[in-house]
Amino acid sequence: MSQKERPTFYRQEVNKTIWEVPVQYQNLSPVGSGAYGSVCSAFDAKTGFKVAVKKLSRPFQSIIHAKRTYRELRLLKHMRHENVIGLLDVFTPATSLKEFNDVYLVTHLMGADLNNIVKCQKLTDDHVQFLIYQILRGLKYIHSADIIHRDLKPSNLAVNEDCELKILDFGLARHTDDEMTGYVATRWYRAPEIMLNWMHYNVTVDIWSVGCIMAELLTGRTLFPGTDHINQLQQIMRLTGTPPSSLISRMPSHEARTYISSLPQMPKRNFADVFIGANPQAVDLLEKMLVLDTDKRITAAEALAHPYFAQYHDPDDEPEAEPFDQSFESRELDIEEWKRQTYEEMISFEPPVFDVDEMES
């Protein structure tokens, strides 16, 4: 929302809370809510398309909330890629910083997520190729900006009727230099180095998640449905084998080293015996993604060039992102200053320019 020409707002009650939005957003209808906000679908009368409007809940309630709000806005503003959710609009009914308390974010309305799709149908190998290719294409972009998503799972991957995919929910994403902050990812898709707090993790935590998702698309079953951290790790090691001593010795955590050294030795299984009937190229790619040693795990850019994606791979159409300045992560500011910086970011937002066919997808 730039302050050039402030739109007319109207008020509407949604699930016992008052929403105050520009008149261009009509037919507000609740579609979901979580800890950090609630979402309505709406008709954008300016463009004629359906959008998702998210009202952040108590965005400046505490320093943690205020910094999270700033982070989410900065991340969404930065993302301009077909396979990553981007910001169409951001607004507040407030007319000045003094009365600024509400933040609304507008993005594309995506119909289904990958969870719905897996439940409804067994996917063909060609479907799996196209879906995983798009996830990796989006990840190459995200990772090139030195951002780790850290919460990749089927419900964070939106898919439309044409099988076109966007990566959602950067609320938890952090800069690669950041250490673990506890609350990340649904455990089933979580890389073991995060789960066990091995600490030295990198962008390939997202590749582990893609491997788990790809295996699920191929088989129709969750790959590692662990009941808790220990059970999860046992399930992982039944497939990957126990880590070699060369990897254990590089773990900074004494507890992790001691615990893993105490486990009974398990050999790595032959993936072809686990994924019977799958395309051998798919199996080969899974073996390169589901590697315990993060230094040996394939990157998004490398995976895009894997023969499994031969019919989709185009090195000239797999863009990287502009560098993303995340020096703010180490800043300790008060609520009012985070709020002021969020307000500045909102005022300076320039909406993306879309072709009609892009909006229709």
From Swiss-Prot:
It catalyses: L-seryl-[protein] + ATP = O-phospho-L-seryl-[protein] + ADP + H(+); L-threonyl-[protein] + ATP = O-phospho-L-threonyl-[protein] + ADP + H(+). SUPFAM superfamilies: Protein kinase-like (PK-like). Belongs to the protein kinase superfamily. CMGC Ser/Thr protein kinase family. MAP kinase subfamily. ATP binds at V31, G32, S33, G34, A35, Y36, G37, S38, V39, K54. The TXY motif contains the threonine and tyrosine residues whose phosphorylation activates the MAP kinases. The modification Phosphothreonine is found at T181. SMART domains: S_TKc (SM00220). The keyword Transcription regulation applies. GO terms for cellular component: cytoplasm; nucleus. Dually phosphorylated on Thr-181 and Tyr-183, which activates the enzyme. Its EC number is 2.7.11.24. Keywords: ATP-binding, Cytoplasm, Developmental protein, Kinase, Nucleotide-binding, Nucleus, Phosphoprotein, Serine/threonine-protein kinase, Stress response, Transcription, Transcription regulation, Transferase. Serine/threonine kinase which acts as an essential component of the MAP kinase signal transduction pathway. Mapk14a is one of the four p38 MAPKs which play an important role in the cascades of cellular responses evoked by extracellular stimuli such as pro-inflammatory cytokines or physical stress leading to direct activation of transcription factors. Accordingly, p38 MAPKs phosphorylate a broad range of proteins and it has been estimated that they may have approximately 200 to 300 substrates each. Activated by threonine and tyrosine phosphorylation by the dual specificity kinase, MKK3. GO terms for molecular function: ATP binding; MAP kinase activity; protein serine kinase activity; protein serine/threonine kinase activity. A motif (TXY) lies at residues 181-183. It comes from the Eukaryota. CDD domains: STKc_p38alpha. This is Mitogen-activated protein kinase 14A. GO terms for biological process: cellular response to UV; embryonic cleavage; intracellular signal transduction; p38MAPK cascade; positive regulation of myoblast differentiation; positive regulation of myoblast fusion; positive regulation of myotube differentiation; regulation of collateral sprouting in absence of injury. Its cofactor is Mg(2+). The keyword Transit peptide does not apply. The modification Phosphotyrosine is found at Y183.
